[in-house]
């Protein structure tokens, strides 16, 4: 399953829940990558860009098959799921899958970072010394405002 930013969305949980519970999947592997475009903009700015186009993010159906499912007012920037740090996002994604009640506890869940700069796959880390020297964070893309927390 691939999505923007490798963020755990309701659709990712839905897909993982189905395959793990009914089709015998025993392992979930999360692979995120450096130089991700989801680091390159601020969620609030994206929300404003939609408003400037005449689109009201507070009044859109998230899923065309469930038009009654809408975000709470003001939650669009959080829902977009922009990120500040690939490693931190990967670690939180692993934790979210491991702790989700619809994912069986015996499913192995791991996460990895593909370093575009070094062409190396490594485990996510909070230690900046173990990251690629050229890896960027959202601040290095020029994003000055911290992203709204996806996990709270």
Predicted regions and their residues:
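Conserved beta-strand-loop surface patch within small alpha/beta domains used
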Residues: 1-15
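Divalent-metal-activated hydrolytic enzyme cores
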Residues: 6-9, 21-23, 38-151
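Divalent metal-coordination and catalytic microenvironments
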Residues: 1, 30, 119
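Histidine-centered catalytic micro-motifs
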Residues: 28-35
């Amino acid at each position: 399953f691939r999505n923007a930013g490798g963020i755990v969305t309701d659709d990712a949980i839905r897909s993982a829940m189905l395959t793990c519970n009914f089709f015998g999947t025993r392992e979930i592997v999360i692979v995120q990558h450096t130089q991700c475009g989801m680091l390159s903009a601020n969620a609030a700015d994206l929300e404003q860009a939609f408003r400037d186009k005449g689109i009201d993010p507070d009044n859109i159906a998230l899923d065309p098959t469930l038009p009654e499912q809408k975000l709470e007012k003001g939650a669009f920037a959080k829902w977009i799921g922009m990120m500040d740090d690939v490693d931190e996002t990967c670690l939180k994604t692993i934790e979210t899958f491991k702790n989700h009640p619809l994912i069986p506890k015996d499913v192995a869940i791991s996460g990895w970072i593909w370093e575009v700069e070094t062409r190396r796959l490594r485990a996510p880390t909070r230690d900046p010394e173990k990251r690629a020297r050229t890896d960027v964070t959202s601040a290095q893309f020029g994003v000055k405002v911290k992203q709204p927390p996806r996990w709270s």
